[in-house]
Structures are given as C-alpha cells and as structure tokens.
C-alpha cells in the first residue's frame, strides 16, 4: 500500500497541512524549523495508519492532539492498495482504488477530547489496513533509535499489538528497538538447527555488507547467542551496542525494518530476490522516519536515502530532517516545507529550481534557498570578517594597502576561499 494524499486539520500546532504523492514509491522529505511541527506530522500519519482501535494501546492524552481553542481536528490519509494487500475476513476489495483512513478529535469540554474514526458509508476500514489481513505494510520510527535503554513496559506491545508495535517508537523517546536483536539471535539458533529459516541471516549479512551502506568499510561479522558483532574501519571487533550513535541509529532501524517486512510478508517473499543475488527487497509499503539525519556524519546523510531507495525500491519513505543533504535522494520523490512558527507563509511542496538546488547543488546552494532559515551559512563574526576582507580588497585594488593590511587580507582569503 501507499499514501496518495495526507491532510491534517487543527492537529497540535498545525492549522492545516496537506501532502500529495503522485509517485509514492521513493524518498519524500519534510523540512522545517524547530517547532514547525515535523514530528507532529509523522506521528499523525502513524496514528492514522494503525487506526483508532490499536491506537488505544498508546495510552495517549488525546487533548494534547487537538489544537488549542479548536473544537475539532482531523487526520486523513488516502491509501492506495497494492496487490499484496488482502481483506480481513470474507469479501472482495471490489472497485475501491482509494481507501480513506480518517480520524477525528472532538472537544467535549476543557479537559476532555473524544478520539474516534470518522464514519464513512463507503467502506469499513477494519477490512483494509486497520484489519488483520496480510500485506498493508507500514512502519514508523522516531528520532531516538537504539537497541537498548527503552521502557520495558512497551516490549509486550510488540507481541500483543504487532501493528502498533511497528509504529511505536515514533510516539515517544522511551521505546527501544530491542526486538530486532532478539530476532537475529533467535535466527542464529535456527542456523544451528539447520532449519530453512536460518538462511535469512546470510541474506541479512549480504544486504548490510553492501559496499555503499556502512561508512569506512565496516562489516557485519557474526550473529551468535552472544549477540551481533561488527568489524569497524580500524579492523576492531565490536558488539553492536558499542558502535557509535550513528551506526546504532541506522542499524536498529534497518534490522527492525527487515524484521517487520518478514512479519508481514514472510521469509520467502522478502528474500526471494536476494536469494538469486539480486540485492533488492521489492515489496511495497510505507516507512516513516523522524529525523533520519540524527547522529549521522554529513557524508552519510548525503547517501542514506539513495541506499534505502536502491535496496527497497518500492517502499514509500517519508522522512523528516534538518539537513539539506538528506534531500539528495529526492530525484525520485518530493520535498515539503512546514512554515516556521509565527510566519505568514504557507507550508508547501518545494518544486522547480529550489528543489533542483537541494538535490543537485552544493551545500551553499542548498542553504542559499533560505528553505532552512535565513542566512544560516555564516555567523555574525564571520560576516564582519567578510566585510573587512572586502574593504581590504578595495584598498589593494587602489594600491593603498599597507604590509600589515596585505598580510591580514591574505589570511582572510585563505579562510574564505569559497567566497573570494
């Protein structure tokens, strides 16, 4: 399945925001200042994907979701099914090409907000992605991605409410992706027992060890009852929990994504191409990631989207970021900007030359669009030094510069090579 259109009305700090996806599979980036509402958007999408029944497991205070002083707020997703998506119970999908997931928040009084599905006579969403039929793949990940350190009370949700568990970490920072490591260790036992499922470990190692994924030629070495071990760029062997924050952030996401794909589609469908040495997982679905750039070096930010879209070519990735480098992979996708708090501008899709600068331009071209705020490139001190360099250049041009000033001018030129 894919999200074709999404809209929010009076949700948290957002009065109105709408996204459309003409070509859903690909890399779709949401940018905006701190406090603009990026996390609110991706959480709203995740809430609508799991549905009102599963969402009760969040134990959320629904009054926090409705914008202050508003009587009603809505989240609406228009879902396009894929051939892999099956109905819950008896019946056929019929002529429905678009399925509507719509949630409504209604203020009862100052302290109470009612949360429910917005009724539609055209469909019963519990037969579609809110149901238990196979397919309908979606997951969501928050910015605090790690293997350990979460609240253990949430662990049982992954088993009792697997659909909610697949989206859980986007709703709070106290959720760790511990299930991914436990799953890998269990797969190792299947290897020892020479069971067919044990081949999954070989396929996962192939995928993670592709040359364009981990920096500095780091490699996944071994998965055993003792845990998951990597070899870093210096040749040292390290347990996965001792890797850097950036490594753990991306690896926990990747392992958990694969685990969820296997849960929904099964081993054979997930790895049938990799088993033939075609290194892709071509299944459809929606993957939401808040702050994909968290803890990543700029060089990794630049290529992370290209890696995910290369090896998961039919997934719709919706990610938030503060980095223009993450937008490099949006040649197959879209870029959206939430307006800054207090601004009169409208939130919108970034198109045309502005989009091209973010995808193809250098980092200064990207910041030059001012889509990431006004003049974030240099500090005030740097600006004053540039002005000083300009004055010294004028003196040099007219031959009125002293030796000390010329020495200062050369020093400033070395500092600001890209500006002179």
Name what the model sees in each region:
Residues 1-176, 195-196, 331, 387, ...:
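P-loop NTPase switch/coupling surface
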Residues 1-59, 222, 226-371, 376-377:
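Switch/communication elements of ASCE P-loop NTPase nucleotide-binding domains
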Residues 44, 140, 203-211, 307, ...:
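Amphipathic alpha-helical segments that form well-ordered structural scaffolds
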Residues 48, 183, 187, 260, ...:
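Solvent-exposed, amphipathic alpha-helical segments
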Residues 68-76, 273-289, 391-396:
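Short, mixed-charge aromatic SLiMs
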Residues 153, 221-222, 380-384:
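Short coil/turn segments at secondary-structure boundaries
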Residues 162-283, 403, 419:
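Extended helical coiled-coil dimerization/tether regions that scaffold
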Residues 342, 352-420:
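Acidic, Mg2+-coordinating catalytic modules of nucleic-acid enzymes
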């Amino acid at each position: 399945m894919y999200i074709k259109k999404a809209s929010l009305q009076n949700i948290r700090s957002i009065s109105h925001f709408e996204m459309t996806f003409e070509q859903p599979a690909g890399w779709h980036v949401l940018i905006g200042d701190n406090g603009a509402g990026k996390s609110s958007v991706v959480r709203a999408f995740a809430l609508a994907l799991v549905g009102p029944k599963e969402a009760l497991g969040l134990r959320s205070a629904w009054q926090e979701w409705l914008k202050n002083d508003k009587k009603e707020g809505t989240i609406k997703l228009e879902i396009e099914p894929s051939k892999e998506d099956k109905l819950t119970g008896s019946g056929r999908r019929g002529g429905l090409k678009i399925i509507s997931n719509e949630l409504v928040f209604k203020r009862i009084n100052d302290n109470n907000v009612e949360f429910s599905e917005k009724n539609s006579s055209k469909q019963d969403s519990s037969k579609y992605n809110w149901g238990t039929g196979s397919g309908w793949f979606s997951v969501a990940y928050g910015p605090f991605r790690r293997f350990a350190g979460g609240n253990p009370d949430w662990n049982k949700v992954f088993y009792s409410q697997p659909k909610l568990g697949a989206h859980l970490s986007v709703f709070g920072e106290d959720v760790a992706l511990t299930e991914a490591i436990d799953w890998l260790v269990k797969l190792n036992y299947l290897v020892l027992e020479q069971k067919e499922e044990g081949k999954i470990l070989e396929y996962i190692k192939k995928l993670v060890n592709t040359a364009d994924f981990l920096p500095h030629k780091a490699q996944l070495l071994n998965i055993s009852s003792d845990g998951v071990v990597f070899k870093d760029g210096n040749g040292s062997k390290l347990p996965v929990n001792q890797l850097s924050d950036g490594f753990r952030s991306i690896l926990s996401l990747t392992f958990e994504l694969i685990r969820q794909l296997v849960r929904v589609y099964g081993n054979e469908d997930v790895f049938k191409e990799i088993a033939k040495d075609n290194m892709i997982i071509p299944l459809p679905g929606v993957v939401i990631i808040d702050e994909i750039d968290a803890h990543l070096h700029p060089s990794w930010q630049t290529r992370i989207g290209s890696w995910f879209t290369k090896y998961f070519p039919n997934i719709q990735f919706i990610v938030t970021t503060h980095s223009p480098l993450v937008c490099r992979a949006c040649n197959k996708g879209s870029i959206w900007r939430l307006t800054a708090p207090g601004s009169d501008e409208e939130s919108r899709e970034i198109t045309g030359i502005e989009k091209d600068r973010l995808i193809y331009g250098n980092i200064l071209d990207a910041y030059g669009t001012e889509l990431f705020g006004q003049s974030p490139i240099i500090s005030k001190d740097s600006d004053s030094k540039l002005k000083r360099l300009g004055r010294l250049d004028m003196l040099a041009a007219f031959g009125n510069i002293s030796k000390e000033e010329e020495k200062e001018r050369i020093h400033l030129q070395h500092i600001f090579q890209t500006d002179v």
